[in-house]
């Protein structure tokens, strides 16, 4: 029997355990569990504190099991002179892939982008994740091969800022 589609809702305080479990699953899937240091307290601050910098959505079954999530935050395009939305994570458990849950998570983030008058929604995808790349293209996403992600970790930020 195939899994039923999940309901999408904003994450609320008390969802930290479920969110962290799903984040851990994504880290394992992406072979990045060695860099995962987030805690439930970190998620509380990130999503639910006053002035929280990010938002989260949960996909739940009728029984309340969390089977997917999306994390987003606002950014800005100087070229458009408009806000944007950056999708940090989108993940659906393998048992619920193919049910439309991932698409509905992305649609929910797209609605948030519209509410914020965003000129664009952006995210990255690992180059080996061909299934995700094909899916993103099928929903209108454009893979920008000419751009490369640049990352500066906390230690590098401190060193660079110090001069």
Language-model features: locations:
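Conserved GNAT acetyl-CoA-binding A-motif
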Residues: 114-124
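A short helix-loop-beta-strand connector motif used in the catalytic cores of GNAT acetyltransferases and
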Residues: 45-58, 86
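Conserved beta-hairpin
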Residues: 54-68
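A conserved beta-strand-loop-helix scaffold within acyl/acetyltransferase catalytic domains
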Residues: 72-79
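Conserved beta-strand-loop-alpha-helix junction that forms the acyl-donor binding cleft
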Residues: 123-132, 151-154
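Conserved GNAT-fold acetyl-CoA-binding loop/helix
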Residues: 20-46
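A short beta-loop-alpha structural element at the N-terminal edge
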Residues: 7-19
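Conserved acetyl-CoA pyrophosphate-binding loop and the N-cap/start of the following alpha-helix
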Residues: 96, 100-108
């Amino acid at each position: 029997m195939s899994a039923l589609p999940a309901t999408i809702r904003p994450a609320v305080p008390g969802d930290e355990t479920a969110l962290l479990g799903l984040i851990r699953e994504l880290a394992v899937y992406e072979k990045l569990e060695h860099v995962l240091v987030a805690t439930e307290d970190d998620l509380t601050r990130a999503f639910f504190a006053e002035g929280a910098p990010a938002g989260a959505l949960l996909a739940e079954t009728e029984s309340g099991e969390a089977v997917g999530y999306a994390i987003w935050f606002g950014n800005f395009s100087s070229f458009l002179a408009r806000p944007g939305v950056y999708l940090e994570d989108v993940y659906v458990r393998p048992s619920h892939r193919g049910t439309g849950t991932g698409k509905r998570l992305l649609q929910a983030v797209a609605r948030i982008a519209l509410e914020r008058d965003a000129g664009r929604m952006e995210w990255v995808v690992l180059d080996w994740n061909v299934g995700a790349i094909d899916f993103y293209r099928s929903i209108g996403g454009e893979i920008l091969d000419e751009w490369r992600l640049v990352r500066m970790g906390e230690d590098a930020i401190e060193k660079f800022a110090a001069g």
